Amino acid sequence: FGQDDAKYGQIKFDLRYRFEQDDSKLATKDKGDASTIRLRLGYLTPEVLGFQAYAEYETNQDFGANTYNSKRNGKVGYEVIADPQEHELNQFWLSYKGLADTEVKVGRQRIKLDNDRFIGNVGWRQMEMTYDSVLVTNQSLPNTTIKVGYINQAQTIISTVQAMQTPFVNIAYNFEGYGKLTGYSYLIDNNENPNQSNQTYGFSFAGKTPVTDDVKAIYRFEYAYQKDYEQNVNQYEADYFHVIGGAEAYGVTAKAGIEQLGGSSENNVFQTPLATGHAFNGWSDQFLTTPDDGLRDVYALLSTKVHGVKIMGVYHDFADDTGSMDYGKEWDFLVTKKFGKHYSLLAKYAYFDADTASNKVDTQNFWLQAGLSF
């Protein structure tokens, strides 16, 4: 709508086609092939007296190959590709900005906190996760963003709902030129999966700063403590840390990191049930649930752009949280390009090489994707 957005509002359109293949050496499962097309169609009203509303419909449909287990179609003999044929009200919220430096948003909404490690929308899957919730964002203090919220229900990536009582606080202070210091508290009380109920308290400092005119240092340090909460009958305590160091220079980004989720036995491990898990610990999704002995992920990433084409490679070495038991290694590769503001293409590949000491098997994943949005 351009300049008429303030008068008439905005229509949001997002169409995404994807072919995905999941092929493992698991003898009891056949290779999964999924050809799907996802549509999101929404309308954002003009702002009136500080109020604004948004409604968004989302649907995902098979478009060709459909030999896969979507977790909803009953095809349990195939590998899981969690993109079911469903349609849903993805977002439906009302916001108010009439208070100074404050926005209050109520309803079904997308929530992405920090890097999505604890609360995110799982945006990689065709149908994202959204939350029936209240979110208050305040920026009254200099360089500070305070987010306080309460989640009553999560609409999952397979279009089911999980009732919960989840208050959260996320406070971030930006040190200009150096990075952002964030402290957080997430209290998840999950009615559907009580073993996923936990309370997490943590902090992070992340940023980048110039070293020379052509080189920037990249860094992140994060620590969190987690224990059981409310309906979880398993009494446990576990720690989490994530350290990244790297540099950007001459159009190339290089990073190395170690991420560790503590664990000691079944149901006594650090878990992040509302995270965008695909963004962490390898794209083959071997560790969306933390193993009983915890997880240590030592990884390295290299990325650049060539004529507007982004190229990325990532290597992971997985072990238990002591480093004494090897789970396997993974190589991930991505090529993607945006064409103007509205079009995009992507190809992605992941190969997980399981260690014989783990209960995993070798797995290959492959994706081709095309997107159109405005």
Where does each model-flagged region fall?
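Beta-barrel outer-membrane channel/assembly domains of diderm bacteria
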Residues: 1-111, 134-146, 196-197, 203-230, ...
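Long, well-ordered mid-to-C-terminal structural blocks that present hydrophobic/aromatic surfaces
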Residues: 232-277
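Short, catalytically relevant binding-site loops at active-site mouths
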Residues: 189-190, 226-228, 260-264, 319
